[in-house]
UniProtKB/Swiss-Prot annotation:
Family matches, as InterPro entries: SMIM19
Protein name per Swiss-Prot or TrEMBL: Small integral membrane protein 19
Keywords carried by this UniProt record: Membrane, Transmembrane, Transmembrane helix
Compartments it resides in: Membrane
Membrane topology: Single-pass membrane protein
Species this chain originates from: Danio rerio
Amino acid sequence: MGGYGVMADEESLDYSVHEAWNEATNVYLLVILVSFALLMYARKNKRKIMRIFTLPPTVGSSSEPNFYDSLQKVRLRQQLEMYSLARKYDQQQSQSESVQLSME
């Protein structure tokens, strides 16, 4: 009769406790079934779900590439200016050398 001691204790418990346990197990069962259904849906529609996460960047986040593009343009412009200044300096040097040669 040792095995029936637990049953005797359950009979003495209030009915609301049994109802609470039933509701709790129903909720757990429902959560498991919904999770399983979502898993099956995800397997079936994997491409649709991945398309959501690979959307093109919004206008707010596109300012960073523009910033870096403008930085590269500024650097390119600086390099071109330095190159043109160096060419002008070289041309002036060669002109002054030719003038000195013609004077001699």
